[in-house]
Amino acid sequence: MNNPVLKPLVIKIGGAILEKESALNALLNVISQLKNKQVVLVHGGGCVVDEMLAQAGFTTEKKHGLRVTPKEQVGLISGALAGTVNKAIVGTANSMDLAAVGLSLNDGDMISCTLSTQDLGQVGVPQTNNSKLLDCLLKAKFLPVISSIGALDNGDLVNVNADDAAVAICQLLNAELLLLTDVNGVKDADGEYLSSLNAEQAQKLIEQGVIAGGMTAKVNAALHAAQQLRRSIAVASWQSPEQITQLLDGHGVGTQIQPN
């Protein structure tokens, strides 16, 4: 796995792509054409979670773009992400002959979690643990589809921010990472898309309120990954799945988050 030519590609999806069947199909079609590339999909699904919580009479609270997960909502959120969303993606992928396998972060002891100290309730901080399951699946040419549900050492389920989950899987496999979002990248104060962004620039834009909400969490996760892996991380739009092949060909796509 450490041969750069053979580095797997971790793609994080979420947001509106999960509500737009044609967009998911287009992404999976591009993945199906990457014949010699090992790919792992990591997904969130906040839109589906919000809908299911509302149907159950719960409200949704977020802090700094991160979901607050009260203990009484964990079962419902886990069912939405590891169940409904995960199996829908797997079903679509398998209909396209992609041999998808649905997983959560704690399957095969891949990722261990500790409870977040940010007063977010049952939210986990992911840490790499054991790559054996993913190694076996990728070697056998399966497409792992991983939900952002993990578990603490005592077995309690926790919700993990999907960007953080993707970063952890990326670190576990020493992989390339592409964070797909609803927009073409990160914007500057003038509303123009940035081709690259480092920690100092990001902090300034966050303080100015230019980077806000869910994009704050995404940029912070990408910066963390860039620092840990010592290479740039791409934040790009799911609306242009052809960018994946451009990225693999060495071209810059979206906003490249740079290590210091």
UniProtKB/Swiss-Prot annotation:
Keywords: Amino-acid biosynthesis, Arginine biosynthesis, ATP-binding, Cytoplasm, Kinase, Nucleotide-binding, Transferase. It catalyses: N-acetyl-L-glutamate + ATP = N-acetyl-L-glutamyl 5-phosphate + ADP. It is an enzyme of class 2 (transferase). Transmembrane segments: none annotated. Substrate binds at residues 45-46, 67, 159. GO terms for biological process: arginine biosynthetic process via ornithine; L-arginine biosynthetic process. Pathway: Amino-acid biosynthesis; L-arginine biosynthesis; N(2)-acetyl-L-ornithine from L-glutamate: step 2/4. One of its GO terms (molecular function) is acetylglutamate kinase activity. Its EC number is 2.7.2.8. One of its GO terms (cellular component) is cytoplasm. The record marks 12, 218 as: Transition state stabilizer. Its main location: cytoplasm. It is found in: Cytoplasm. It comes from the Bacteria. Belongs to the acetylglutamate kinase family. ArgB subfamily. PANTHER family: N-ACETYLGLUTAMATE SYNTHASE, N-ACETYLGLUTAMATE SYNTHASE, MITOCHONDRIAL. Catalyzes the ATP-dependent phosphorylation of N-acetyl-L-glutamate. This is Acetylglutamate kinase. The gene is argB.
